[in-house]
Amino acid sequence: MRPPRTTELDRPMTTAASQRPRVPRRLLDGVLLLDKPVGLSSNDALIRAKRLLLAKKAGHTGTLDPLASGLLPLCFGEATKFSQDLLEADKTYEATMRLGQRTATGDAEGEVIDTRPVECDRAAVEAALVRFTGEIVQVPPMYSALKRDGKPLYEYARAGQTVEREGRNVTILALALLACDLPDVTFRVTCSKGTYVRTLAEDIGEALGCGAHLTMLRRTGVGALTLEHAVTLDALSDADDASRDAWLQPVDALLSTFPLVRLDETSAKRFLHGQRLPLSALDPIDAAEGERVRVYDATRLLGVARKANGVLAPERLVVTAA
């Protein structure tokens, strides 16, 4: 019996998209300091940058709200091993809050739920900022990604539900007034991991007796990294391949605040095999007990180790150094 004849209608349709050759991705190691625009999620920004750089492996170092702009460090290849260190790092922001109005979300996207007269002056604002410097307790906002019973808080909020949240200790390392054009107040804050600048603005507004919400947020620093060497997606898109690669910083840009240890050839080989190195066999290491250090041979980053119990113990190794 002959097999049935196929017709043009039976054949799978081909399109320009299906015929387009796939662009090969490449292994790329380094850090891209991206100046994220307002309106784009951190994940979408990562996807665009990864596509422009034709990179195989990439990740970001903690989300920046779509309504916020500014510094978003992106890690490629071996740099992804050290992204956790930036998650733990202090952050610096410039923010503008509007006094006299509270919103459902704590920012300009939410519905105004409370309006009060603004009866304070610049001196009162400056005094309030001083009160919020140092260790403070924050109650996380309902419109946040924190989870309760496996569900983000913002899902409860969108359903009109309020979930009880416990206050958390955070540290405001610096809080400076940049402009006071009431009812708008612009400030710069350097804060510990887990600080909600929206909540900080709301709490300052309550301390001033008029409430407040955030109208602008721009991140200018993550640990030792700053916007000074950041690139926008538009600039990255307009650049040629060589110029795009030039924006990549080396992996150890993430580790610049770690004490430095340099090993001889023999010790470097042992380190790359995951062996602990007795401190007695090494040059003195300027690091406290239990402190993490960045480890190099004569020219290359080998990884990160911890100085503890008389040894230098490898924790993260750079594969490309092996």
Curated annotation (Swiss-Prot):
UniProt keyword terms in alphabetical order: Isomerase, tRNA processing
Residues at the catalytic site: D65
Entry superkingdom: Bacteria
Catalytic activity: uridine(55) in tRNA = pseudouridine(55) in tRNA
Segment forming the signal sequence: none
Functional note: Responsible for synthesis of pseudouridine from uracil-55 in the psi GC loop of transfer RNAs.
PANTHER family xrefs: PSEUDOURIDYLATE SYNTHASE TRUB1, TRNA-PSEUDOURIDINE SYNTHASE
Organism: Burkholderia lata (strain ATCC 17760 / DSM 23089 / LMG 22485 / NCIMB 9086 / R18194 / 383)
Bias-annotated ranges (Basic and acidic residues): 1-11
Similarity comment: Belongs to the pseudouridine synthase TruB family. Type 1 subfamily.
Principal EC category: isomerase
Gene: truB
EC number per UniProt: 5.4.99.25
Membrane-crossing segments per the record: none
One of the GO BP terms on file: mRNA pseudouridine synthesis
Protein's recorded name: tRNA pseudouridine synthase B
Gene3D superfamilies from the UniProt entry: Pseudouridine synthase, PUA domain
Residue segments, region Disordered: 1-22
GO MF term set: RNA binding; tRNA pseudouridine(55) synthase activity
